[in-house]
Amino acid sequence: MGGLASGGDVEPGLPVEVRGSNGAFYKGFVKDVHEDSVTIFFENNWQSERQIPFGDVRLPPPADYNKEITEGDEVEVYSRANEQEPCGWCLARVRMMKGDFYVIEYAACDATYNEIVTLERLRPVNSSSLATKGSFFKVTMAVPEDLREACSNENVHKEFKKALGANCIFLNITNSELFILSTTEAPVKRASLLGDMHFRSLRTKLLLMSRNEEATKHLETSKQLAAAFQEEFTVREDLMGLAIGTHGANIQQARKVPGVTAIELGEETCTFRIYGETPEACRQARSYLEFSEDSVQVPRDLVGKVTGKTGKVIQGIVDKSGVVRVRVEGDNDKKNPKEGGMVPFIFVGTRENISNAQALLEYHLSYLQEVETLRLERLQIDEQLRQIGAGFRPPGSGRGGSGGGSDKAGYTTDESSSSSLHTTRTYGGSYGGRGRGRRTGGPAYGPSSDPSTASETESEKREESNRAGPGDRDPPSRGEESRRRRLGPGKGPPPVPRPTSRYNSSSISSVLKDPDSNPYSLLDTSEPEPPVDSEPGEPPPASARRRRSRRRRTDEDRTVMDGALESDGPNMTENGLEDESRPQRRNRSRRRRNRGNRTDGSISGDRQPVTVADYISRAESQSRQRPLGRTEPSEDSLSGQKGDSVSKLPKGPSENGELSAPLELGSLVNGVS
C-alpha cells in the first residue's frame, strides 16, 4: 500500500475509531475503502497499517455533541489497560461526583475496580453506530505531473475540500492520485465538476507563489547589497549578444569571480549591474562583460602593409590581442568619420582587448613609417651618388655602370653589405655589365677574385686582335680602360694585374715573314714610367703608352728572356710540356741585383738556343706571374692571350715576400695561334 502525504493541521485520512480486542476504541484513519473493509493506519503508528472489517470501525462523535454528565450515567473514559498500549475509549459508569473529580467504575472489570478521573477524560457514550459498506465514499482524480509536488501539501486543498463537503482530501504517493473520502454521496458528484477548475487554480497559485518567493529573495539580496560595492555600465544593443556570450558563458564567468555576489542585467536598457565584496572583484567582472567598438586611423598607403599578404599581419594582431573581430571601412561606408588620406580599422571586443590591439597596430604603423623614412633617405643618397658618379661613367657604356669606372668603384663595402635592402644598384660595384664574369659566392672584391674571370670574352678578344695591327694600336676606349684598371683597396688580397707584353698573332706572323728583323722588339716587357702627377695605382695615359711602344729598344732594356728566367713556375716547351730540367727560380730579387752589376745587362751566354715559340711561351708565363704593382695591363696583353689550354700554377712568393693570388697561364701550341 502506498503512503500518504500529510501536512498542516489536516488529518491525513478520514478519522475513525477502531475497536480493539479488549473492547476499547482506538483512534485511526481510513486510507482506502474496499468492498468489505477499510485500510486503517493508527495514530503514532503504534500498530502497523492493516485492513479492518467495517464491523470494527465507527465514526467519532460529532464535534458539537455535548451532554451533561451526572451520577449513574454511562460514559467513556480515555484510559489504557497497560503501559504498552495507547489510550482508548473504554465504557464505564459514574459512581460519585465531587467538584471536578469523578469516581468511575469500569463495566468490564470488577465492581471493586474504581478510578478517580477529571472531566477532560470523560465524554458521553458515542452514538455513532458501527460502519457498513455504505458508510464511506471514495473519489480518485489523476494529478498532472507538474502539480504533484504541490498536491502533496494538503493545505492547498482546503478550499476544494470545503467546496466539495468531503471529509478529507490527500495525495496517494504510490499511484499519484488525489483521494477524496466522504461519508456522504454529494462530494462524489461535485468532484467531477470542480476537478479541472481546482487544478487550474492550483497552477495559477503556484506561479504567483514562486514569484513572491523570488521577490522575497530579491528583497533580501538588495538589502544585503545596499552596503556593498557595485559597478554599472551600458553596452550597445548590437553588442549585447557578445557581452552575454554563448548560452550566457560570459555572465557565468563573471559570476565565478571571487568576491562577486550578484550580477543584474536590464535587458531593455542594456545595463549591467555588478555587486561585489571588493571593488577589484567588480572591475574584473566588468572586464568580462563590457564589450565596445573603437577604431584606429591608418594611412591609406600603408593599408596593404598593415593587412599583409592574405591578411596574415592583421590576423596576427587579432589573435594576439584577443579582439573578436576587426573591420576595415570602405570608402562608401559613412558610418564612422574619416580623416583625409586615412582608412579606419575598427576593432570589436572588450576594452582591454581593444587597447591591446591598438597598441600592436600603432607600434606596427610606427615601424612602417620608420622604414619608409629610411627608404626615402636611401633614395636621396642614391640620387646624389648618381649625380656625383655621372662624370666617371663612360658616355657610350651599356653595361649598367657596374663594369668598372673610377678607382673608387672598389670602395663599396657598405653598399655591398646592404644588399638585403637594395638588391639592385645602379652605381659602382662589379658583375653588373653584359658579357662579364659573374660570381655568386662573394662580393665585388675578395679572396676569390681572379682577373682571368673578369676579362672579356673570346669573341671580344678576337675582334680586338683583328682590329689591331702589328705595330701601333689605338688607345682603348674609356670603358675598356676602366675595366682593366686595378680595383681599389677592399676586402681580401688585391687582384693580380695583367702583364704588359705586346705580342699578338698578327705580330708573330710578321716576324715569320721577315726573319731578318729583330724578334726581340716584339717581346718588350719593360714598364713605362708613370707620370709624376698621376696617383698610385692609376694606369698611364693612352698617349704615353703609345709613345712608349714606338720607342726603339736598346740592349739595356729587359727582354722576354729575363722574364722567362725569373718565372716562378715550370716553363712550357713548344710541345706544351713542362721543362723539368730547369729548377724553379725563387729568389728573383737577388738575381735582379746581380744582373744590375753586369756591363752588358744580359744573362750568361751558356744557355741552350731557344726558338721564338719558346720566347713567346715564356713571356706569356712571365706576364701571368708578374706580381702586383709592376705594370698596368695594356691593350696588347688582352688580345695576346689566346692560348688553347689553361693550367693552374701553385702559389709562389712575390718580390716583396707576399703570397700572390692563384694565376691562370695560357700557352701557344707550335708557336702560332
Curated annotation (Swiss-Prot):
Residues 413-422 have a biased composition (Polar residues). One of its GO terms (molecular function) is mRNA binding. Residues 584-596 have a biased composition (Basic residues). Disruption phenotype: No visible phenotype; mice are viable and fertile and do not exhibit any overt phenotype. Mice however show behavioral abnormalities, characterized by hyperactivity. Increased proliferation of radial glia-like neural stem/progenitor cells in the adult dentate gyrus caused by increased Nog (Noggin) expression and subsequently reduced BMP signaling. Misregulation of a number of transcripts involved in memory or cognitions is observed in the brain of mutant mice. Highly expressed in brain and testis. In brain, expressed in the subventricular zone of the lateral ventricles and in most of the granule neurons of the dentate gyrus of the hippocampus. The keyword Transferase does not apply. CDD domains: KH_I_FXR2_rpt1, KH_I_FXR2_rpt2, Tudor_Agenet_FXR2_rpt1, Tudor_Agenet_FXR2_rpt2. Keywords: Cytoplasm, Phosphoprotein, Repeat, RNA-binding, Synapse. Residues 228-276, 291-340 form the KH domain. The tandem Agenet-like domains preferentially recognize trimethylated histone peptides. Belongs to the FMR1 family. This is RNA-binding protein FXR2. It comes from Mus musculus (Mouse). The lineage of its organism: Eukaryota, Metazoa, Chordata, Craniata, Vertebrata. The gene is Fxr2.
